[in-house]
């Protein structure tokens, strides 16, 4: 029991460390800043953060959510992204155990988390994230090569439909980044799970979009990336169980 608890603690710590790097990507990629050489600093006073200011999650709590020098508030995004990434890693390892699949899905979830925040703010999905997920799909497919046809169909079945929709509406109904996202995630998940993920993402997005319009009383541009990503994450964790329940219920 104790070794298992220690393992999950290590996994969570690893998750929040990667989550800290995701915050760097979320902040710098839209601004086209260098993600390697640029020093982390306070957005208010420019104070260059020391290593002890950058300990994921714990530094934020120790500083009370404020800059060490100017005492300006630090965005709550930083601890939320770190903690959420850690929790997602725990869920993946709880579901898939110590396996290549767990490693691939953890990296997938991190990419989805970062691109979701960027897309929500900028309405663009940086192409690098889709290329990264494509690489994960190829690696995953190499370990599950007997299912290559499922993955190939998954790559095409949703993305081709969305591509037609994209050109038919001049990009007003769906973004090009969303088309690519569904293609590369389909390569990773296979056709059954990507269809489930797409439909679920559309439902989640529609409901939240309607709530936002109802509350604000005005229209909003819908960034689909976060909702499609949520659909993919749910499909990875519970999609097969849902599909099995659905088939048993109706057949």
What is the predicted role of each segment?
Residues 102-103, 107-206, 210, 245-251:
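Functional transmembrane core segments of multi-pass inner-membrane proteins
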Residues 81-88, 129-137, 179-181, 224-229:
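Core segments of transmembrane alpha-helices
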């Amino acid at each position: 029991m104790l070794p298992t608890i220690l393992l999950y603690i290590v996994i969570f710590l690893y998750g929040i460390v990667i989550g800290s790097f995701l915050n760097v990507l979320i902040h710098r990629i839209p601004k086209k800043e260098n993600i390697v050489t640029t020093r982390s600093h306070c957005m208010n006073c420019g104070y260059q953060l020391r290593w002890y200011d950058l300990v994921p999650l714990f530094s934020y709590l120790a500083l009370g959510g404020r800059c060490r020098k100017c005492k300006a508030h630090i965005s709550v995004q930083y601890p939320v992204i770190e903690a959420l990434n850690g929790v997602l890693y725990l869920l993946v390892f709880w579901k898939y155990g110590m396996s290549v699949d767990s490693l691939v899905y953890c990296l997938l979830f991190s990419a989805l988390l970062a691109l979701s925040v960027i897309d929500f703010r900028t309405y663009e999905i940086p192409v690098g994230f889709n290329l990264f997920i494509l690489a994960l799909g190829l690696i995953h497919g190499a370990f599950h090569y007997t299912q290559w046809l499922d993955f190939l169909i998954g790559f095409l079945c949703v993305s081709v439909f969305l591509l037609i929709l994209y050109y038919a509406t001049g990009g007003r109904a769906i973004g090009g980044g969303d088309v690519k996202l569904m293609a590369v995630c389909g390569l990773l998940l296979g056709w059954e799970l990507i269809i489930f993920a797409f439909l679920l993402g559309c439902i989640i997005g529609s409901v939240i979009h309607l709530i936002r319009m109802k509350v604000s009383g005005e229209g909003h541009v819908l960034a689909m990336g976060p909702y499609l990503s949520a659909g993919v994450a749910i499909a990875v964790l519970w999609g097969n169980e849902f599909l099995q329940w659905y088939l048993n219920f109706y057949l």
